[in-house]
Regions:
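N-terminal cationic and glycine-rich segments that engage phosphates or anionic surfaces
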Residues: 1-122, 127-137, 199, 230-233, ...
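Positively charged, low-complexity, intrinsically disordered RNA-binding extensions
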Residues: 137-256
Length: 256
């Protein structure tokens, strides 16, 4: 089954994508710093800084992000986390997490992207209340000793884990996320990324080229938007159809 990073990965090499990575990490750090600006006593801030450094964000950008929350940077506006929910073609449910310092810029952009590709922007809770679960997801480097890992993970409140290439993805209930992550850290497992995420309860199969193409373009536009941090969806598209979509996009300019 196709997964969202297929689209996001196409933009990694561009200068524009690098600028967005810096921008999003800066906002994540600013949000995390609201609780406390010292990463030694603010685990969320420490995680945000670690993630930013892993993606190549420079120290001066990180320092400015912390100063932004503290009010030292007087030219900066407050960063907000806003979720937008709706549907893509084919009845595919979509949740977009945006980090913005200007609602008047972000909201019209989200409405445009949904409508331009045959989707509909809904009200808060219109899909998150029934189409998704909300819980923890922790990615670690696949350990050499899987037997030991299984023994450790069974002693935690983790829900499940799956192998994805050289990574292990552990899922948890929202209330158990912190304790499971702490147990993995104490056991010296290398955490690649972690956070609270939406997970589809059921997937919506898309078998036709036209809706699959519009979903592709919609997600591509979300990826390009400077305020969009994460997109979750319920699309179930075969690898064969997804490859056909990618080939079509590569050969022709899509028009909405």
């Amino acid at each position: 089954m196709w997964r969202w990073p297929t689209v996001a990965g196409q933009k990694e090499a561009s200068a524009k994508a690098k600028s967005k990575i810096y921008n999003i990490h800066s906002k994540l750090i600013t949000l995390a710093a609201e609780k406390w600006s010292d990463p030694s006593i603010n685990a969320a801030l420490a995680d945000a800084i670690h993630s930013a450094k892993r993606d190549g964000v420079t120290s001066d950008v990180i320092e400015r992000a912390v100063k932004r929350w503290a009010g030292i940077d007087k030219d900066s506006s407050k960063v907000e986390e806003i979720f937008y929910e709706g549907y893509a073609p084919g009845g595919v449910a979509i949740i977009v997490r945006a980090l913005t310092d200007n609602r008047n810029r972000t909201a019209p952009s989200m409405r445009h992207i949904f409508s331009a590709f045959g989707g509909n922007l809904g009200e808060t809770g219109s899909v998150s209340n029934f189409a998704f679960d909300y819980g923890g997801e922790i990615h670690i480097k696949k350990p050499a000793d899987m037997d030991m890992f299984e023994m450790i993970i069974l002693d935690t409140n983790a829900e499940n884990y799956i192998e994805e290439g050289e990574e292990i993805v552990i899922t948890t209930a929202r209330e158990n996320y912190a304790s499971v992550k702490s147990a993995l850290e104490k056991s010296d497992y290398e955490i690649i990324s972690s956070g609270l995420w939406y997970r589809a309860k059921n997937y919506t199969e898309v078998t036709e080229m036209e809706p699959a193409l519009k979903i592709y373009k919609m997600l591509e536009e979300f990826a390009a938007d400077e305020d969009v941090e994460t997109v979750w969806n319920t699309a179930d598209i075969s690898d064969t159809l997804w490859k056909e979509v990618e080939q079509f996009v590569a050969s022709k300019k899509f028009r909405t």
